[in-house]
């Protein structure tokens, strides 16, 4: 018998995932060209040729080294990910944004969902609050519930779908632990304006001073 927590989670299984599965079944029945899938934000374009070529090169190099090379490709690695990969990402970020990251500032995870769950496990206590901007990716609610925390929803401006910043300020409490910013947004595709982001930062600083707490700001950027 599975736990009551999992039973409850299964009863409220992701509508987005259900739509995706239904879409796959309909595509098999009626043809891919006749079904338009607006569920998961799945990539609709192939991987760049340069990426495919780089993967082939890695596999060819591994084959040339024999068993040792093969183990280097599919064996265990450091928990944070390959250091040379993290360093390359850090250098790219530094070049683009004028930051000073090193490999030690980065941790690689298997997808953003895994990353968010790890972070939530690290920072959340029961009844802590995580703020999201509506409309939002529905799985955020379950990620918080995994650690007995609560999602607090900030409403949008229905004309622009930018966050209602007055509502944000009203929703922050002493139990607020984190805010998730997802831009371009899933599901609307809206990109939050630079001035919106600046105002969000100012509100967070104001509320941190008011409550004497620290908030974590998560930027979820799959798109």
Report residues per predicted region.
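A short pocket-lining beta-strand/turn micro-motif at the edge of beta-sheets
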Residues: 34, 213-214
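Walker B catalytic acidic pair
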Residues: 221
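N-terminal small-domain helix-loop-helix segment of the aminotransferase-like
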Residues: 2-111
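Conserved core of the PLP fold type I
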Residues: 61-212, 218
